[in-house]
Amino acid sequence: MNVARMWTIARLELVQRLRAVSWYVLLGVFGLILLGVTALSLLAFGGWAGGGPGIFSVVVCVTLLLVLLVSPTLSGNSINGDRDAATLAPVQVTLATTGEILIGKFVAAWITGLAFVAVAAPFLLVTMIVGDTNLAAVAVSLVIVVVEIGVVSAIGVALSGILARPLFSVAVTYLVVAALAVGTLIGFGLIGSAVSSEAVSKSRSFTYDLRGYPECTDGGDDCEGELDRMACGEWETSTYRVPRFDRVWWMLSSNPFVILADATPTTFDDSGNPDDVFGWIKASVRSAQIPPDLAPVWDGCDPAVYDGGGSDYRTPEETIAQTVPSWFVGLAVQIAFAALLLWWAWARTRTPSRTLPPGTRIA
């Protein structure tokens, strides 16, 4: 492949976008939304000690959300739109190969998406100045956002080469993005709830009379707090169904927001709680990896439990430490899927073409 020819294709695509007034309007609306989000985040986290990481994570998540909503429109008609406008065929008869055309349009779509990150840069800088933001978290989160923009751009360009109608390819690109961002959550919840297991729990506690006083083993009526004299009830058994999210947690690994949160380094406060949105998302997703207890036992007559101890609660920090990251697997799946679609688009766009969809314009 010739880099100069690929850049020429990308530059032509970018020049067409720069000439459109709607492009600048879209960037302006994007900036206004981020301004409002940043202001609200400052109000929400400003009263917290060390609220900078929380503000930064909110702005980054909203930036990724907005780019995911905009990118399908910018890349979903790159090839079939040119075919409808009769501008693809003149390019195909030049020295530019099909692969160079595809890569050039992909690079242009990626750069276009990065323009929105550039608009978000001042707001991200403000959030970094406001609080003590972890520089490692800043660097990793921005890299993941840039890569996710590239993945969505590649999917949109590929679908525009696979499908003949621009409107249809844009719609399918939106569906793919929705499947990754929302469909994975829905599938995780529904399948995890459907794939359930039976749990049998046992519990017992001290017995109390009608006045609310504990019953005493020696027949007395004043044994409050004397555990060796308080009467303990019989064991009670109950059976119920427990969702098995630990069997389907991998479905979330390809979610763009889960990848972003899981890859970003997390810092914790003294109680083991994350100091940003990334950490809370990571802890929530990682907790799904832990199998549920199918035979729980609660002994209210145990002195440790009676005194308020015996809890098996895990802090988010402990949950993250006991589980494994999955962001690199999800990102690899996304990249492989985008690469497969690009190969399919190359096969559909290459010339000479043996067959074309009915009604396809070639010149």
Predicted feature locations:
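Long, hydrophobic alpha-helical segments
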Residues: I55-A86
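Hydrophobic alpha-helical transmembrane segments of multi-pass membrane proteins
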Residues: V59-L66, S75, L142-V147, V329-A336
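Transmembrane alpha-helical segments and their membrane-interface loop/helix boundaries
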Residues: M1-R11, V15-S22, G28, L34-G36, ...
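Helix-loop-helix units of permease transmembrane domains in multi-pass membrane transporters
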Residues: L74-A115, T349
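Alpha-helical transmembrane segments of multi-pass membrane proteins
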Residues: V15, R19, G99-F116, A120, ...
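Secretory targeting signals
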Residues: T38-A39, A44, S57, T63, ...
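Hydrophobic/aromatic residues in alpha-helical transmembrane segments
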Residues: L68-S75, I155, L341, A345
